[in-house]
Amino acid sequence: RYISVTGVQTCALPISAALKAADAVKKRIAWVVLQKIKGTPMDDVAECPPVDDKVLTMDEFEFKNSEVLHKPTSKIFTFVEALKMAYFNRMSLGEYAHFKTEGLGYDKAKGVGTPFKYFTNGVAASEVELDTFTGELKVLRTDILMDLGRSLNPGIDHGQVSGAFVQAMGWVTSEKLYHNKDGKLLSHSPTTYKIPNVQDTPRIFKIDFIENNGNTANVHRSKAVGEPPFLLGVSVWTAIKDALKYKSGKAIPQIISPATPEVVLMELAKYDSQL
């Protein structure tokens, strides 16, 4: 969905590289529109000059509702018209920019500072069922709660969270690497390296978001959601350990990851030998 320019500009901290690049393109479009309003023949202009406050006053322009408004003259151009003017007058509509997050620093000795501009937090609870004869696992239910600030697209964020969780679930339950004595990887294909499929996903899978406006460091007060939910998949591994503890009646076992059916059966065999 479209995020209004006014909403983006409410970020108190410097904009990202993408927004910096977009801002440069906006200035070029505004400059071309201004030449059109002034009636300047574009053949007399070799190229768009470096656009700064001396050349162009961006406050005179408003980009909104797919239109470009020049406030002093009240002239309005559709966004398509403005783009065509820029394109056919050989103005670049592409740009790149670099951005370095400001205000970061951390004193390891004192344990104080700001190592990251913001944190993406989440919590997950998983319920599992173990087959004591085969060591196979079923994830009966998983509930996830994520803090993503103000979500730009809840549908995409939901997919990111669920995908990262399932990926991590496979990482801690089935994705085991095998090497021969020479160090050559043997589990190098789907036939030897088991990744989770749709049947491995939680039978009940609920994901919810906490929406807040506290993150001023990112676009539209949103938060990144690529990798952070991956760590929540560890809840499946810890649930397996709790299930084994219930079976043994003793302390939580120190099993390895991934907790494959073989690992589970070997742990269960220890309990049988102790009976």
Where do the protein language model's features map onto the residues?
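C-terminal catalytic domains of large/alpha subunits in multi-subunit enzymes
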Residues: 12, 16-275
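Single conserved hydrophobic/aromatic residue that forms the stacking wall/gate
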Residues: 1-11
